[in-house]
Amino acid sequence: MQQSQLIKKILLTTVSLFTFMGSVYADSIGDIVESTGIGGIVRNNETLPHDIGSDIVLYDEARTGNGRMLIEFLDKEELALTEHTQVYIDEVYYDPNPSLSKMSIRMVQGTARFASGNGKKINKANIDITTPTAQIA
C-alpha cells in the first residue's frame, strides 16, 4: 500500500515538474508590433499567425514570405524582418543590469535589422547573430 502511494507521489511530482518547465519556456520575451503580408511564427512545429500583439517566446522561428514583421523584445530591442526571411530566436536573457543580458539569433535566410539602441542596451559582446555565411558576436 505504501509503495503504491509513493509511486503516485513520484508520478505526480514528475508531471508537475514537466508542466512547470513547459510554462517557463512559454514566457513571452516580446511581441509583434508591425506585420504585413504573408508570414508566421513557428512554435513547437505549429505555424501561428503573425498578428500584431502576438507573443514571441524563446525558441520561436519567425518567418516571412511576401511580407514583413517587426518584433519588439521586452527591453525595447527590435528585430525587423523583410520579405522571405527566416530567423530562429535561440537565446534571450534579460537582467536589470544590461551588461549581463544576452541575445542569440540565428538567421537562415533573408534580410533582418537588429536595433539595440532603443532599450537598456545589451552589451554588444553579449549579442550573437549567426547567418549562413558569417557570425556577428
Predicted feature descriptions by range:
Residues 2-11:
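Bacterial N-terminal signal peptides that target proteins for export
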Residues 11-20:
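Bacterial N-terminal signal peptides
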Residues 26-68, 72-137:
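Flexible, surface-exposed loop/linker segments and immediately adjacent secondary-structure boundaries
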Residues 1-2, 106:
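Helix-centric, low-specificity signal for extended rod-like, repetitive segments
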